[in-house]
A protein has these predicted regions:
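Cationic, histidine-enriched alpha-helical/coil surfaces that engage anionic ligands
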Residues: 1-135
C-alpha cells in the first residue's frame, strides 16, 4: 500500500487553518498519484490506490469539517469512493469468476459456461463504469 505524502512543517503552534490547507493538499496530491493508471484503461492497482487515498482525504475533511466549507467537497469525495468501489468490486468478482471457470470440471461444460457467462456480464458492467471514471 502506498504511504501517504508526509506533511512537513507542522508543529504545535501551527494555525489550524494553515495546518488544514497543508494536510488537505497532501491528501489531494495522494489522490492524484494513481491517475496515470486511468489513462489507457483502468488497472486494478490504480483503483485500489485511489480508493485508499480518497479514504484518507475524506478522513481529513471530516477532521477539519468544523472549519466550514468542506461538506460539498466531502460529498464529492464520497461519490468518487462509491464509483471506485463499484469498479473494484467488479474487478474482484471477474477475477474470482475467472479462477472458478478455470477450476470447473472439464466434464461439466455447463458449469464452466455458466460461470463464464456470469463473468462476461460482470465485465460488461465494468466497461461502462470504467468509462465513467475516465470521463
Amino acid at each position: 500500500m502506498a504511504q501517504p505524502t508526509p506533511i512537513r512543517g507542522l508543529g504545535p503552534d501551527t494555525h489550524l487553518g494553515h495546518a488544514a490547507r497543508r494536510i488537505l493538499a497532501g491528501r489531494l496530491a495522494d489522490v492524484r498519484k494513481p491517475e496515470a493508471g486511468f489513462q489507457e484503461g483502468v488497472d486494478d492497482e490504480s483503483v485500489h490506490q485511489m480508493r485508499v487515498a480518497l479514504r484518507r482525504l475524506r478522513a481529513a475533511l471530516q477532521v477539519f469539517r468544523p472549519l466550514g466549507g468542506l461538506r460539498k467537497l466531502e460529498r464529492q469525495v464520497k461519490r468518487m469512493q462509491d464509483a471506485l468501489g463499484d469498479v473494484r468490486d467488479l474487478h474482484v468478482q471477474a477475477a474470482w469468476l475467472d479462477g472458478a471457470a478455470g477450476k470447473a470440471e472439464k466434464d461439466k461444460p455447463g458449469v464452466r459456461a455458466g460461470i463464464t457467462s456470469l463473468r462476461d456480464a460482470r465485465l460488461a458492467q465494468l466497461d461502462a463504469r470504467e468509462r465513467r471514471l475516465r470521463a
